[in-house]
């Protein structure tokens, strides 16, 4: 087996190789001196921006979680408040209903008592008026009896006429 060079037709000389190495080294030094600093700065800025963006994203995620928890707590609190308001409204409605019923009962009782008192007063007034009329009639009958001396039959007729006059 014979070794064949890759570039069979090309002659590689050491001087050319050294020259290429020197030119490549000079080019590398020029790139390092002129371009490496700005490229390195650009890469560092990019790295810092990525870090800042990741930190901002984490911060935003934490804020979003906090807001979601606050909203959930507020919603739960709102539900509890709504339940409490409904409970209070029912309680107030029941109290108001009971109060209205008790006031109506008290008013009805007062009206009944007043009606009883009015009826008793009317009865008393009617009795007093009847007594006065009976007294007046008695006086009138007595005057007539005294004015004329009546027989028993005349007196009976006179009383009957008087009673008939009361009915009218």
Curated annotation (Swiss-Prot):
Q: Which family does it belong to?
A: Belongs to the ATPase B chain family.
- Compartment(s) where it occurs, according to its Swiss-Prot or TrEMBL record: Cell membrane
Any one GO molecular function term: proton-transporting ATPase activity, rotational mechanism
Q: How does it sit in the membrane?
A: Single-pass membrane protein
Q: Which PANTHER family match?
A: ATP SYNTHASE SUBUNIT B (PTHR33445:SF1), ATP SYNTHASE SUBUNIT B', CHLOROPLASTIC (PTHR33445)
Q: How does it assemble?
A: F-type ATPases have 2 components, F(1) - the catalytic core - and F(0) - the membrane proton channel. F(1) has five subunits: alpha(3), beta(3), gamma(1), delta(1), epsilon(1). F(0) has three main subunits: a(1), b(2) and c(10-14). The alpha and beta chains form an alternating ring which encloses part of the gamma chain. F(1) is attached to F(0) by a central stalk formed by the gamma and epsilon chains, while a peripheral stalk is formed by the delta and b chains.
Keyword set, alphabetical order? ATP synthesis, Cell membrane, CF(0), Hydrogen ion transport, Ion transport, Membrane, Transmembrane, Transmembrane helix, Transport
Tell me which GO cellular component terms the UniProt record holds. Answer: plasma membrane; proton-transporting ATP synthase complex
The entry's protein name is ATP synthase subunit b
Domain of life (superkingdom): Bacteria
The keyword RNA-binding is assigned to this record:
no
